[in-house]
């Protein structure tokens, strides 16, 4: 590292000890001790130094590495960082995919339940409408039955009134028939007590449409001619 020397006197590190200040300057041991008020010769900041050797802090040791080696190390480190981040991203994506899959399954399950609930609601709604129709029909049928029952309850009284009117019509004949017919006793008297025994009666008492004057009732041929001859049915008068 020929490029390292004291920034104040120019001495090389192989000739004396060198120190690295906190402000980024390098001074030899003599210059460091002779620093006025312990200030940096260049920037006038307080001197805080670390000896440059193999025991230097790792973060300060990086300042003295070969740039090419440092670049190679940085590339390797960068590769490790990239690989680490890629692996973590892959794991992250897998976790997110698993969560998305679970969410999809939960969504599908919820959707299936929603469809089942919707179908059940529609089924119950249809059953409710059918029950309403049945209830309406039952009410109409009930009203018809109640009307029929009322009609049947009123019908006996109507039949009773009709029968009563018919009974009154039969038991109370018109006054004209009574006046025309008369009681049975009067009718018997009007018949002159006509005897049905034709043998005990003379033919002169029988009413006929033929005049009986100047007729000899004792002649048998006359009676036969009047009541028997030339007729389809024989005379009801018994011959003597």
Curated annotation (Swiss-Prot):
Top-level taxonomic group: Eukaryota
Start-end of RING-type zinc fingers: 6-44
GO-annotated biological processes: homologous chromosome pairing at meiosis; reciprocal meiotic recombination
PROSITE patterns tied to this protein: ZF_RING_2
Expression (tissue specificity): Expressed in the germline.
UniProt subcellular location: Chromosome
Any single Pfam family the record assigns to this protein: zf-RING_5
Chain spans, region Disordered: 152-189
Keywords: Chromosome, DNA recombination, Meiosis, Metal-binding, Zinc, Zinc-finger
GO molecular function: SUMO transferase activity; zinc ion binding
Record bears the keyword Zinc: yes
GO cellular component: chromosome; synaptonemal complex
Function text: Recruited co-dependently with zhp-1 to the synaptonemal complex between homologous chromosome pairs to regulate the formation and number of crossover events between homologs during meiotic recombination. Together with zhp-1, promotes the accumulation of pro-crossover proteins, including zhp-3 and zhp-4, at a designated crossover site along the recombination intermediate. Limits the number of crossover sites along a recombination intermediate by restricting the association of these pro-crossover proteins with other recombination sites during late prophase.
PANTHER family documented for this protein: RING FINGER PROTEIN NARYA-RELATED
Assembly behavior: Interacts with zhp-1; the interaction is required for their chromosome association and stability.
Protein name: Zip homologous protein 2
Provenance organism: Caenorhabditis elegans
Organism ancestry: Eukaryota, Metazoa, Ecdysozoa, Nematoda, Chromadorea
